[in-house]
């Protein structure tokens, strides 16, 4: 079953409003003054729908506002100006992480999670290696088949069925181990960069990077499930540190694993490639087009939340989880 565009927007709004009322509104501070022209649920719904890249006539927040103003005034009678809409989105960016977590709580079932890093370039072509937008946080890094990129690095934990459970961002030149450290410490409620300590337990063996890292509540809920990782996370010191400090069991493939174990491990981790491919193709995670740090955090959080919601809608309709490209007709 597919959805026409109007039915999709209505379904998305109903789901978002239900989550907002139960998981977000109770945490919102009381505000005085006149009522807002658009409700938070309407703003969040449009901000999430704007991340879709398949079956929709828009490619950005500006595009969906233009579309809503021209074609869907019966669904959204009061449409904010573009600048006001952008401000509301940035102020509510944390709501996207709460939506992501609420959906993950409902959909994530199974025995293990999977973790991997993902480069997010922020500029195309020659501009990729010159300062521009996000010049204070974007850096040249290596990732994605050992290619260089100019942007930021994402570390994500994904459930075995493909549902995103948490993520962290850092400058492109920050090693993946430190981005994972930030993610795990955030999940444990003590965000920071400590790393393994020396034999006396006083000083870190390796000093943490000084580049930008987003210390924000995007890591998701703590879990006792084992996390499968690639071989780059091997090392007894780091694995023991994460287990002791944050209660996280990271399981990289052993070097001397037998062929059958390597085959199972590779198959189990295939969901990582599927997830990042869908985030890129159906939700535009690469080249997010943000001009500021908060704009980048808002868009990344919205894209991951939209991805989880897409899986939820597909399941409600009895469709394959990752059939995003054919959901809207």
Model-found features: residue ranges?
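Short alpha-helical elements
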Residues: 1-329
């Amino acid at each position: 079953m597919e959805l026409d565009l109007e039915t999709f927007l209505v379904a998305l709004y109903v789901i978002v409003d239900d989550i907002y009322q139960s998981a977000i509104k109770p945490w919102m501070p009381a505000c005085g003054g006149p009522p807002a022209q658009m409700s938070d649920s309407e703003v969040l719904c449009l901000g999430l729908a704007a991340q879709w890249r398949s079956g929709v006539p828009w490619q950005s927040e500006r595009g969906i506002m233009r579309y809503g103003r021209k074609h869907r005034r019966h669904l959204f009678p009061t449409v904010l100006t573009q600048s006001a809409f952008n401000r509301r989105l940035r102020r509510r960016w944390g709501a996207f992480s709460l939506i992501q977590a609420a959906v993950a709580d409902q959909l994530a079932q199974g025995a293990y999670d999977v973790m991997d890093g993902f480069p997010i370039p922020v500029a195309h072509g020659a501009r990729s290696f010159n300062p521009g937008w996000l010049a204070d946080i974007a850096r040249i890094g290596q990732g994605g088949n050992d290619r260089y990129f100019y942007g930021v690095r994402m570390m994500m934990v994904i459930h075995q069925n493909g549902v995103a459970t948490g993520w962290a961002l850092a400058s492109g030149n920050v090693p993946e181990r430190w981005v994972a450290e930030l993610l795990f410490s955030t999940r444990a409620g003590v965000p920071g960069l400590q790393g393994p300590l020396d034999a006396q337990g006083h000083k870190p063996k390796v000093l943490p990077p000084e580049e930008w890292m987003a210390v924000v509540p995007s890591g998701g809920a703590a879990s006792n499930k084992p996390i499968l990782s690639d071989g780059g996370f091997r090392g007894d010191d780091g694995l023991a540190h994460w287990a002791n400090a944050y209660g996280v069991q990271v399981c990289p493939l052993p070097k001397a694993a037998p062929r059958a174990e390597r085959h199972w491990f590779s198959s189990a981790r295939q969901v990582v490639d599927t997830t990042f491919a869908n985030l890129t193709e159906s939700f535009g995670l690469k080249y997010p087009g943000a001009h500021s740090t908060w704009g980048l955090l808002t868009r990344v959080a919205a894209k991951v939340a939209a991805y989880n919601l897409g899986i939820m809608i597909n399941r409600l309709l009895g469709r394959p989880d990752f059939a995003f490209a054919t959901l809207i007709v």
